[in-house]
């Protein structure tokens, strides 16, 4: 439920001293203001849902509010849109949102299209420390891991395992 988002994000922000992201389908600028009120430090802007001008406008709102914007792309056209909108942080979703197949090499392939001065984050499908090592060697600056951690019965151990190759 919608109220769970508010409670969860606030509880997380109260419990940790690290940046948090509102990983949601941001489709209205109001949601960016909500993210700020909830204590998020970053919002996810999905290029598959937003045209270049909308990404640019939402990114400007983020800048005014002191929020980071992670602009997510899945293919070359979406990466180009993110860059044209002025993204300083691009995330590449390794999960194809049309058929839900996963290929972590999507990040290594698209890394070549994104200038090195733009932070590059690999998202989805990262399951092992070896996956992370491969991504880091390809120039990836960070990873966004959700499902692997959430499915693990021992999340702390899994996180230590994933960090072991960085």
Label each region the model flagged.
Residues 1-5:
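Short, small-residue-biased leader/transition segments that mark boundaries at the very start
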Residues 6-15, 21-22, 28-37, 42:
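Acidic/glycine-rich phosphate/pyrophosphate-binding loops and surrounding catalytic core
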Residues 6-10, 103-109:
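Charged helix-capping and loop-helix junction motifs
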Residues 15-18, 37-43, 63-67, 84-91, ...:
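Glycine-enriched alpha-helix->loop->beta-strand junction motifs that scaffold or abut catalytic
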Residues 18-28, 41-52, 65-79, 91-101, ...:
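Catalytic beta/alpha-barrel core
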Residues 27-39, 76-85, 122, 126-145, ...:
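Catalytic cores of alpha/beta
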Residues 34-54, 91-100, 140-158:
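Glycine-rich phosphate-binding active-site loops on the catalytic face of alpha/beta enzymes
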Residues 109-113, 136, 151-166:
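C-terminal helical cap(s) of enzyme catalytic domains, especially alpha/beta-barrels
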